[in-house]
A protein has these predicted regions:
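Core catalytic alpha/beta fold that binds nucleotide/phospho-ligands
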Residues: 16, 20-238
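Cysteine-centered motifs
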Residues: 2-5
Length: 238
């Protein structure tokens, strides 16, 4: 059988399975939905469902199902489906998600700005009607030691506490990733172009950071972060 025919069968069965499961009730794992003072909104989905259960929760166009089915990793497919489950939860109307050439997500049928992040266990989105956004989430079970050399400035390295280093590195990394997503630029040097001010590690807190453009123009940002269930999440609006 040719590869094209095989792929068509996989896509067909994927969509068919979604239709079969639609008659069953599945418990939704919306972990957090939070409206911020700046009128942005954050929603977090805990991925506890199977792939089949996630399919039952959502209504996805055939072309999007085809795109999701191309991912070989079940974890990646579940993350994509969980994003769509969040969109269904947050928006009253059906949203169509797409991506720019640089990978930045956008909603085809809505002017609302969106940023997306995910781990194996959690998927999160942040939305705002006008302002640019950035969000990133990471598991604290990951070893962030490599971040120190590749993404931190000398001043940031000096501010590290040996007893809390991995947590601090995770926050630094998430903050810089969130800013990177917000700026939507290619080839950003995290160590040289994004400077995060020293902070006191807490379960929830605020961060100050500076993005240095290649023409040396500086842009300042205020970020927020929270730690939950061995995960760190950092976001910014504006």
């Amino acid at each position: 059988m040719c590869l094209v025919c095989t792929h068509r069968i996989v896509v067909y069965r994927y969509a068919e399975f979604h239709d079969i499961l639609s008659e069953y009730f599945i418990f939704m794992a919306l972990y957090l939905r939070k409206k911020l003072d700046n009128k942005a909104e954050i929603a977090v989905w805990q991925v506890t469902e199977t792939e089949e259960e996630l399919l039952n929760l959502i209504s996805v166009p055939t072309d999007e199902l085809e795109e999701i089915s191309l991912f070989r990793s079940e974890s990646q497919r579940k993350q994509k489906l969980a994003v769509r489950a969040l969109l269904n939860e947050v928006f009253e109307e059906k949203m169509y998600l797409n991506h720019h050439d640089n990978g930045q997500p956008y909603l085809e049928n809505c002017v609302t700005n969106i940023s997306i992040t995910h781990t194996d266990k959690y998927v999160a989105i942040i939305i705002h009607d006008e302002d640019d956004l950035g969000i990133d989430i990471e598991s604290l079970d990951r070893d962030f030691s490599a971040v120190e050399k590749k993404a931190l400035s000398e001043e940031e390295i000096e501010d590290l506490d040996d007893e809390k280093k991995n947590e601090q590195l995770a926050i630094y990394w998430c903050a810089k990733e969130a800013i990177f997503k917000r700026m939507s630029q290619n080839r950003v040097d995290f160590a040289e172009q994004i400077e995060v001010e020293k902070f006191n590690l807490k379960k929830e807190g605020e961060l100050e950071a500076t993005f240095i453009h290649k023409d040396e123009h500086e842009e300042e940002f205020d970020l927020e972060y929270m730690i939950f269930d061995r995960h760190v999440m950092v976001w910014l609006v504006g």
